[in-house]
């Protein structure tokens, strides 16, 4: 715990250095295209916009068409036919859409970046992407191991940290407040779903009945109506976690980031759920029965410093390191 506190205290100094480093910008603004496994879901790219802008770079997410683009979304999007000329194509996975984009942009340099967790099993189309990859990056050592297995490669993967940890919220927990972290109940054209919503709903009911204050951190693609009986956070789950005594939910990409804030986690793990081991490792415990929820939250603790560092990666300067790898 002392080691993690030291890491967290460094983020202020390193964050200041990051602002200075990015302030001067690049000699020439890079033009980056991004293709994700969730073609219309821009929430994984959005945290990179500010850092890219300070660097004088432009990020554009590739979409199959404009039908599912959210009006007012700050992330620039374009179809392959409309896309600007680019210096680099970044793929965040090896699903059909990223693989199709790699094939389409045959003369563009390609990089892979883990922006969302991937199950450590080689993707069917990874072999189409591997030969084109100039560099591969991940947030943490644990994520790098999973991402490498997913891509079917033993190449070096650069661990750069997560830009979201460059400005972690200061934790001020409120008594009896529990953050409930949802996943996606039903798959759609944008992406898949994770099992476990019924378990999480039942666990949330138990917590509310026990006198806990429930604050819901809603996944961007989750059905809001399932959770409207509770308070739904108006800020990101990462920001909301700073208020919570503990968090409970279906393990996902945000779990290590919330642990980095200092908020302990309980995982709701449906037998059908398939996630990398490191997402479970940051949990104080996992439950498969709603009746276990209250006791698990009351006793929730952070993992040891080594586990946390393995899952979170370096804190501070992550955006600078990522853009350096893309330059």
Which residues make up each language-model segment?
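Conserved catalytic-core segment of nucleotide-activated headgroup transferases in glycan assembly
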Residues: 41-45, 165-167, 173-226
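C-terminal alpha-helical cap of glycosyltransferases
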Residues: 311-327
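Active-site and donor-binding regions of nucleotide-sugar-utilizing enzymes
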Residues: 33-166
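Catalytic binding pocket for nucleotide-activated donors in carbohydrate/polymer assembly enzymes
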Residues: 254-307
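Short acidic-hydrophobic, aromatic-tinged amphipathic segments that line or gate anion-handling sites
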Residues: 76-79, 231-236, 282-292
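Donor nucleotide-activated moiety binding/catalytic core segment of transferases
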Residues: 220-261
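Short loop/turn segments at strand-loop or loop-helix junctions that form parts
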Residues: 93-94, 113-118, 162, 179-187, ...
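N-terminal export signals
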Residues: 2-26
